[in-house]
């Protein structure tokens, strides 16, 4: 277990739910002992409902699980973040989350039909509100670079508990990991074996 700076315990290894992971695979993950499940609101890559269905059938107490979800970048902004959060609770069939992260610091590509209501700074304030209410046990960010994380650390009332980033043998993320270590923020890596695609420029991709 990793201990976040607020004392919350988080499993060291989790089951990533990107790529439209379905209930049978999730039930298998539960049966072999996975207890951390990482999902997100972005239906472009994730299906929170499948996670919720698996948990409902998995015969594991909610208190034994660590559920992480992430805000869709189209909902950046104070009001929209607070409005979007309950959707994750409903889809995951839970009354609280163990961690809720900003998925990206901004919208990009085709993710957003229009500009979000606000920016990541306003959205972070909303996460701090959710944390103060006890609706989430830890808050953090995903896909923030060192400069953006430093900006967050400079303005946050609640220091992020968790920073999630892609890391594999070709992307060690040393500056970001060092920044997290200096501030007592837990670094969490995803896609550590490599991204799930064949790419001659990425020899470690799986």
Locations of regions flagged by a protein language model:
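N-terminal binding-site loop/beta-alpha segment at the start of enzyme catalytic domains
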Residues: 1-65, 82, 126, 193-197
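Active-site mouth loops of central-metabolism enzymes
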Residues: 10-21, 70-79, 109-118
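Short, acidic/polar
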Residues: 19-30, 77-92, 145-151, 171-172
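Conserved, mostly hydrophobic/aromatic
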Residues: 15, 37, 51, 67, ...
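Beta/alpha (TIM)-barrel catalytic core signal, keyed to glycine-rich beta->alpha loops juxtaposed to Asp/Glu
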Residues: 22, 104-206
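A short, structured active-site edge motif that brings together acidic residues
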Residues: 63-75, 99-105, 164-167
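Short acidic capping loops at alpha-helix termini that bridge into adjacent secondary structure
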Residues: 12, 61-65, 95-99, 137-138, ...
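CE4/NodB-like, metal-dependent polysaccharide N-deacetylase domain
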Residues: 81-102, 129-133, 154
């Amino acid at each position: 277990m990793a201990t976040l700076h607020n004392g919350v315990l988080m499993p060291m290894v989790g089951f990533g739910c990107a790529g439209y992971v379905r209930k049978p695979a999730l039930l298998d993950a539960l049966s072999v002992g996975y207890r951390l499940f990482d999902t997100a609101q972005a239906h472009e890559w994730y299906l929170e409902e499948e996670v919720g269905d698996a948990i409902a059938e998995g015969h594991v107490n909610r208190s034994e699980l660590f559920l992480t979800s992430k805000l869709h970048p189209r909902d950046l902004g104070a009001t929209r973040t607070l409005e979007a959060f309950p959707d994750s609770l409903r889809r995951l069939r839970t009354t609280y989350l163990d961690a809720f992260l900003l998925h990206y610091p901004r919208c990009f590509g085709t993710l957003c039909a229009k500009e979000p209501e606000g920016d990541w700074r306003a959205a972070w304030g909303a996460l701090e509100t959710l944390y103060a209410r006890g609706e989430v046990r830890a808050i953090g960010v995903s896909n923030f670079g060192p400069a953006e994380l430093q900006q967050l650390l400079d303005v946050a009332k609640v220091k992020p508990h968790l920073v999630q980033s892609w890391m594999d043998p070709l992307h060690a993320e040393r500056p970001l990991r060092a920044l997290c270590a200096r501030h007592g923020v837990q670094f969490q890596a995803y896609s550590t074996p490599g991204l799930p695609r064949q790419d001659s420029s990425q020899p470690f991709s799986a």
